[in-house]
A protein has these predicted regions:
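Extended ligand-binding clefts on enzyme/binding-domain cores
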Residues: 5-8, 12, 160, 204, ...
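Inward-facing hydrophobic residues that define packing positions of alpha-helical scaffold repeats
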Residues: 75-78, 162, 169, 213, ...
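Conserved, well-structured interaction surfaces
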Residues: 48-121, 156, 173-179
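TPR/Sel1-like alpha-solenoid repeat signature
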Residues: 106, 193-200, 212
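Acidic, glycine-rich segments characteristic of secretory precursors and extracytoplasmic regions
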Residues: 1-34
Length: 238
């Protein structure tokens, strides 16, 4: 049972661990994106991969189902930490942890919804961004009981999902602790800026994409790959 700030931190670490699952960023979901986009080839005749290659996925496709479940599980753990009555009441006793945990939870939630809207929503475009139910359901409060878990949440528009992602990342950038105070593997300001640059790129807002990418590049803390073409040869295994 969650009673203390330490309990909430363990739950937050569970949300980070959820990112590593195969249905989120742990492996086969990302490979599935490559197969759907024809950047990769399904060279095995298994049901899931053949469906994805042919763009005929249905509800029983294990890769799609795991993507949905694992990502929403991580989002819900983040919501339980910082965006639930219980989490908020516990964090009220420690304002420093409150700001940090809310920023980290916002980052995880943004990453999750960016993953989901690209997998299950329409691409962001002026002609489709405001069509009802073409995004994914937005759950912004932690689900703490079975009754709430089974409530039907309608899909939001693509525009609404992207607006939430951007709002969460802006909050994370403003409130994440400095990099020297962050344990390895946890969200950083530069990580949030890099993700926000990618979000704006997918939104076709190239000015803001360049703005946040340049902020990360200009820190001079990271090396840039000088030969991207080398990463896409058939023999490339990285």
């Amino acid at each position: 049972r969650i009673k203390t700030v330490d309990d909430l931190e363990n739950l937050l670490l569970g949300a980070y661990n959820g990112i590593r699952s195969s249905g989120f960023w742990g492996g086969r979901t990302l490979r599935g994106f490559d197969v759907i986009a024809d950047d990769g080839v399904a060279d095995v005749a298994t049901f899931e991969w053949v469906q994805m290659s042919a763009h005929t996925m249905n509800l029983v496709n294990a890769v799609g189902r795991d993507t949905w479940t694992a990502t929403y599980n991580a989002i819900n753990m983040a919501n339980q930490v910082a965006f639930s009555d219980l989490g908020e009441s516990i964090l009220a006793s420690d304002p420093q942890k409150e700001a940090q945990f809310k920023a980290e939870a916002s980052f995880i939630r943004a990453l999750g919804y960016f993953h989901l809207v690209r997998a299950f929503g329409l691409p962001y475009a002026e002609e489709t961004k405001d069509i009802a139910e073409m995004g994914v359901p937005l759950r912004l409060r932690g689900v703490m009981d079975r009754a709430t878990a089974f409530e039907v949440v309608q899909r939001s528009t693509v525009s609404e999902v992207y607006s939430q992602i951007i709002s969460d990342l802006e909050y994370a950038i403003e409130n994440l602790p400095g990099e020297n105070k962050v344990e390895s593997g946890r969200a950083t300001v530069d990580g949030a800026k890099a993700l926000l640059a990618k979000v704006y790129f997918y939104k076709h807002d190239f000015g803001n994409a360049a703005k946040y990418a340049e902020q990360v590049i200009n820190t001079q803390k990271y090396d840039l790959d000088e030969d991207l073409t080398a990463k896409f040869g058939r023999a490339e295994k990285k």
